[in-house]
């Protein structure tokens, strides 16, 4: 009837055979899910005085093709037009200040969006999976783009300039295959996780963004044309895999950076990392396979270096981590074949194979604070000559110095009780070793192949020795074993 001002919630929901509907011009509101699931609804022109379209109101009305949203609209509820496949253009009028999450979700016929309402936030998922959108015009008032707002808009190339933009939500522009330009981001503070993941054509420099605090995990994963990580005075966090494919030869002037997530800068283009005075956390694989990296500046506050953090950084010569009170994860520096000297005096924990295959490493200044040392920690550091004081360990791990062929100077602590299997195997250059009176067990092959050992004195405290402990020690001229060894 002409006097009708509202259509109640769910009134025609799932009326699958419903075809064109004519509504009176005086209609002010279409309730939640009013026509949801009316899959054959072909036409439903919105009246000129309409103020509200409820949540899911036209959900899955696949053939619904009324393009014009009246200027009187002030609210569109969440998922109101989801999967309305025949929509080709959307204009958000100046009065339409309340648009719900996913309002046009998967409307893959839309090609053009003109958002005139002066909103500050673009809702989550509002145009998610609108694959064929080519043009988007957003108001200059926007300061935040919600999560997944333009996710998988595969034909989108340009979204204009956002001089006031402070936050881009997670996956906001993820899988936008043709996106090239996102304009000015001078006010940006946070770029959410996966915000631009797989946007291979995106051209963007991050240099000089004065307010940027957070780059979320995978934010620019798979974005080879993203460049620059210099002069970012507010940056505090780089998330996991955030810049793994970007073109970033230098990291410099990041005075507040505290955290680099897993694989955050695992980047083959990276050559130099400047001083990071606030850095505390280096995540697993953070610089893994950064095969061009030569210099890592001073980072005196680091407390954690994750597993594989610098794995295969074969050109890394300068490492500004001397004296840090850190925990070092397994394989953290494995195969860093250009490192020559390390001061680990304040390190408390070193994981398995942390420095294995560091072939040019000559000196470890000290291990005096160590409370946990993993097996194979320095295996095949073939140039290692000197290991400073080792902390109060009770067990020297298996193969910890195996194949350290140049090792000539190492001092075991008087807390040592067990020398592990093959701990010094094939340390050909080791001329002497003092086994503390605290040692009770020497496991098999512990000193096997130490061909330079001249004197072997096993203290009376040792009650158990494995097979071939001193096998191949052919230079030994004096050997003393305990009287009661079993």
PLM regions and their residue ranges:
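Structural signature of tandem-repeat unit edges
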Residues: 1-6, 16-29, 39-52, 62-75, ...
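Consensus positions within tandem repeat domains that build extended binding/scaffold surfaces
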Residues: 8-13, 31-34, 54-57, 77-80, ...
């Amino acid at each position: 009837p002409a006097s009708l001002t509202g259509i109640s919630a769910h009134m025609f929901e799932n009326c699958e055979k419903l075809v064109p509907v004519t509504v009176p011009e005086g209609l002010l509101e279409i309730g939640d899910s009013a026509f949801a699931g009316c899959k054959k609804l072909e036409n439903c022109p919105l009246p000129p005085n309409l103020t509200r379209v409820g949540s899911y109101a036209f959900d899955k009305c696949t053939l619904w093709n009324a393009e014009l949203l009246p200027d009187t609209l002030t609210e569109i509820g969440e998922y109101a037009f989801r999967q309305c496949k025949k929509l080709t253009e959307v204009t958000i009028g100046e009065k339409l200040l309340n648009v719900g999450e996913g309002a046009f979700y998967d409307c893959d016929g839309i090609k053009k969006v003109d958002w005139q309402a002066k909103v500050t936030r673009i809702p989550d998922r509002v145009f998610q999976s609108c694959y064929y959108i080519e043009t988007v015009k957003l108001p200059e008032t926007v300061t935040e783009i919600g999560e997944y707002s333009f996710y998988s808009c595969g034909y989108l190339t340009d979204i204009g300039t956002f001089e006031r933009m402070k936050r881009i939500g997670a996956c906001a522009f993820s899988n936008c295959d043709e996106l090239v330009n996102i304009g000015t981001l001078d006010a940006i503070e946070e770029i959410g996780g996966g915000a631009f993941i797989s946007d291979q054509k995106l051209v963007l420099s991050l240099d000089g963004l004065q307010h940027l605090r957070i780059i979320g995990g995978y934010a620019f994963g798979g974005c080879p044309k993203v460049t620059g990580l210099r002069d970012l005075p507010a940056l505090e966090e780089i998330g996991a895999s955030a810049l793994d494919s970007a073109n970033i030869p230098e990291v410099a002037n990041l005075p507040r950076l505290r955290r680099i997530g897993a694989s955050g800068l695992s980047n083959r283009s990276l050559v130099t990392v400047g001083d990071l005075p606030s850095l505390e956390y280096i995540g697993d694989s953070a610089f893994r396979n950064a095969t061009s990296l030569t210099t890592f500046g001073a980072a005196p506050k680091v407390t954690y270096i994750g597993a594989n953090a610098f794995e295969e950084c074969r050109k890394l010569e300068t490492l500004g981590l001397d004296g840090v009170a850190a925990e070092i994860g397994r394989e953290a520096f494995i195969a860093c074949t250009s490192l020559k000297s390390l001061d680990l005096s304040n390190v408390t924990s070193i994981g398995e194979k942390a420095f294995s295959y560091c072939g040019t490493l000559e000196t470890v200044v000290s291990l005096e604070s160590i409370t946990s040392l993993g097996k194979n920690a320095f295996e095949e550091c073939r140039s290692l000559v000197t290991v400073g004081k080792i902390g109060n360990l009770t067990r020297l791990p298996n193969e910890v110095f195996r194949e350290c062929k140049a090792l000539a100077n190492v001092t075991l602590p008087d807390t040592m009780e067990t020398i592990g299997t093959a701990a010094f195997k094939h340390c050909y250059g080791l001329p002497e070793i003092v086994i503390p009176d605290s040692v009770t067990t020497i496991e098999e092959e512990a000193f096997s192949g130490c061909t330079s050992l001249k004197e072997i004195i096993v203290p009376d405290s040792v009650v158990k020795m494995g097979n071939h402990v001193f096998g191949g020690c052919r230079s030994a001229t004096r050997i003393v074993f305990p009287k009661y060894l079993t």
